[in-house]
C-alpha cells in the first residue's frame, strides 16, 4: 500500500528537520540527558562514604590529604536581588597517629565576608567515619565565629573523634549577595588533593570571566548545554535556553611547598577567580578594568569627599606646626601628633564610611580611620597627600589580570 503523497512529503520534512536539529545540538554540545544535572546535587552523596575511601592508597610522607573537594555554583533570583549559592562538599583522610597533625586535619575554618551581610554560611553538617563502620555526627552547632579582620570572619570548628584512619566529611552552603565577583575556588593546599570537581550552573542573564592563578597542574575543562524543556522543537514555539553548565576538574594535585612562599600561601596556591563579564536580558558585556575600579572608588567611597565633610580637621592641620612650613619635619610632627592621640584597634582596613571625630579623642579606631585623619591634617597643612591602597603581605600579591576593589586590604599614605 502506498502512502499518500502529502504524508511522504511530511515524513521527509520531519526527517530533514530532525537531522538539522541533531547537527545543531551536536555543534552546541546540547544534551537531552537530565542525568547530567544530577552531578550538581553533590549533597546527595553526603553521609555515604564507600569502603574504598578507607582502602585507597594515600600519599607517602603526608599526614592527611583531601580525598575529594566538590563545589557547585548556582544562582537564585529573589525579590531582593540575585544571590549566588555555592555548595561545598569536602572529604579528608587522616593517615597519621601524630596528635598534632590529627588536630590540624580536624580543625576547619570557613572564611566569609560579613559587612552588609554579604555572605553567610548555612547547611553546615559533618561526619567522622572510622574503618570499622562507626561514624560520629557533627551538627554545626558547636562552630565558633572568629574575627579575622575588618572584612572577614571565620566559622571555625573541630571535627569529632578523629584518629588515624578516619575519614572526615563536611558540607555547607555559602550564600553570597554580591555577584559581581565570586569567592576564589582553591585547588591546591598544604597537603595533596586527590580529586577536585567544580561545577557552575549558569543563568541565561549572566556570564563570568574566569582567571586561572598558579595552575601548574592539569586542569580539565568541559561545558555542556542541557535541554530540559518539554516544549516541542517546532520553530513557531518559543523554547527556553538550555541549561549551560561548566565543569573544571583535576586529580592528584601536589601540595604547596611551604618554602615556596614568604608571606602568604595565596601567592602560590592554585585557584580560579570569577568576575562577572556579561549581564542582562539580552546579555551585554560589562567593563572590567583598573580604570573602572578607580571610578568605583571615586563614586562610592571617595576619600576626598569625606575630607570635605570633616573640614575642621583641615583647619587643625593648617594651624599645627605652621612655623615648620612644608618640610619633612612638619610631616613627621603631624604624624606624631596623630600617633600619640589615636588608639589603634588592631584592625587593618581599606576604606571607612564612618565619622572621624573619635580618632583624636583616643577612642578605638581602625587603620583607615586613623590614616584618614592624618591625610586631612597633611592636606590642610598644604602638603600634596593621597591615600595608597595596597595588599598587605599576609593578604597576597595583587593579580593585575583581575581588577577588583577586594584585592586591597590596607590603606597607607603618600605625602610630599
What spans do the regions from the language model cover?
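Secondary-structure boundary elements
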Residues: 291-362
Amino acid at each position: 500500500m502506498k502512502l499518500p503523497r502529502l504524508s511522504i512529503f511530511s515524513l521527509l520534512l520531519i526527517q530533514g528537520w530532525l537531522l538539522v536539529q541533531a547537527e545543531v545540538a551536536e555543534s552546541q554540545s546540547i544534551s537531552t540527558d537530565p542525568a547530567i544535572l544530577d552531578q550538581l546535587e553533590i549533597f546527595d552523596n553526603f553521609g555515604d562514604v564507600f569502603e574504598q575511601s578507607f582502602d585507597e592508597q594515600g600519599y607517602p610522607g603526608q599526614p592527611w590529604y583531601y580525598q575529594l573537594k566538590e563545589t557547585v555554583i548556582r544562582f537564585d533570583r529573589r525579590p531582593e536581588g540575585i544571590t549566588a549559592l555555592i555548595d561545598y562538599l569536602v572529604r579528608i583522610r587522616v593517615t597519621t597517629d601524630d596528635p598534632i597533625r590529627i588536630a590540624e586535619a580536624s580543625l576547619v575554618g570557613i572564611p566569609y565576608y560579613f559587612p552588609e551581610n554579604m555572605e553567610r554560611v548555612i547547611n553546615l553538617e559533618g561526619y567522622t567515619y572510622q574503618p570499622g563502620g562507626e561514624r560520629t555526627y557533627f551538627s554545626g552547632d558547636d562552630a565558633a565565629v572568629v574575627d579575622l579582620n575588618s572584612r572577614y570572619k571565620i566559622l571555625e570548628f573541630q571535627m569529632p573523634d578523629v584518629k588515624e584512619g578516619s575519614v572526615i566529611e563536611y558540607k555547607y552552603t555559602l550564600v553570597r549577595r554580591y555577584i559581581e565577583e565570586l569567592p576564589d575556588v582553591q585547588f591546591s593546599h598544604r597537603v595533596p588533593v586527590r580529586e577536585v570537581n567544580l561545577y557552575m550552573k549558569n543563568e541565561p542573564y549572566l556570564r563570568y570571566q574566569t582567571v586561572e592563578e598558579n595552575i601548574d597542574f592539569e586542569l580539565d575543562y568541559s561545558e555542556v548545554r542541557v535541554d530540559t524543556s518539554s516544549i516541542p522543537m517546532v520553530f513557531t514555539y518559543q523554547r527556553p535556553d538550555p541549561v549551560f553548565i561548566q565543569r573544571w576538574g583535576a586529580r592528584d594535585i601536589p601540595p604547596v611547598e611551604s618554602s615556596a612562599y614568604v608571606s602568604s600561601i595565596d601567592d602560590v596556591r592554585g585557584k580560579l577567580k570569577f568576575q562577572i563579564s556579561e549581564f542582562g536580558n539580552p546579555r551585554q558585556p560589562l567593563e572590567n578594568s583598573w580604570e573602572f575600579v578607580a571610578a568605583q572608588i571615586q563614586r562610592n567611597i571617595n576619600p576626598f569627599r569625606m575630607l570635605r565633610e570633616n573640614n575642621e580637621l583641615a583647619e587643625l592641620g593648617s594651624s599645627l606646626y605652621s612655623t615648620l612650613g612644608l618640610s619633612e619635619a612638619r610631616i613627621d610632627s603631624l604624624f606624631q601628633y596623630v600617633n600619640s592621640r589615636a588608639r589603634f584597634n588592631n584592625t587593618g582596613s581599606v576604606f571607612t564610611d564612618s565619622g572621624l571625630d573619635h580618632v583624636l579623642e583616643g577612642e578605638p579606631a581602625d587603620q583607615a580611620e586613623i590614616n584618614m585623619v592624618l591625610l586631612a591634617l597633611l592636606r590642610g597643612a598644604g602638603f600634596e597627600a593621597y591615600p595608597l591602597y595596597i595588599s598587605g603581605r599576609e593578604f597576597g600579591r595583587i593579580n593585575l589580570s583581575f581588577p577588583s576593589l577586594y584585592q586591597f586590604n590596607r590603606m597607607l599614605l603618600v605625602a610630599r
